Amino acid sequence: MRIILVCICAWFVAQVIKVILNTIRFIIDKKKGNVTKKVTIGTLFKLGGMPSSHTATVISLSTCIGALEGFNSNIFAVSGVFAFITMFDAFMVRLPVEKLTEAFIGVREKVEGKDVKPIKKVEGHTIPEIIGGFIVGAGIALLFLKFSPLFPEYVSLFAA
């Protein structure tokens, strides 16, 4: 259960960073006069953007498992494969789907007189966004492992 808490915290921190970065972007765009998106509380639950919260979550999971069970353990191998698939999907699947969705929305907007239902834009991740999520996830996990009373057996491993 304690590893789940670390994962939730990593996800939350990544989402808060997204809100902060989107707010900064909004302020800069507003000053330039080209505001396209608003920042709302709903931004906290949006997919896509910097950093990848999916990556932060799975990397925090893998980091905790590796630290507690051993980096040679079978469960760490499983979590590592799971993390790789998640990051691969974010970049190689969701990003192209985002581009296709944008193209479809553009075509749909040009079709007049047709009853075409709008589709929700799916957002993927760029490599820097995935790396950002990796850093957040590993960082949060290491902070919990070092400083949290949830992991007393691991705190002693940091002692010299």
Predicted regions and their residues:
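N-terminal signal-anchor transmembrane alpha helix
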Residues: 1-22
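Membrane-embedded catalytic cores of phosphoryl/pyrophosphoryl-handling enzymes
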Residues: 12, 36-160
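Membrane-interface helix-loop junction between the first two transmembrane segments
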Residues: 16-39
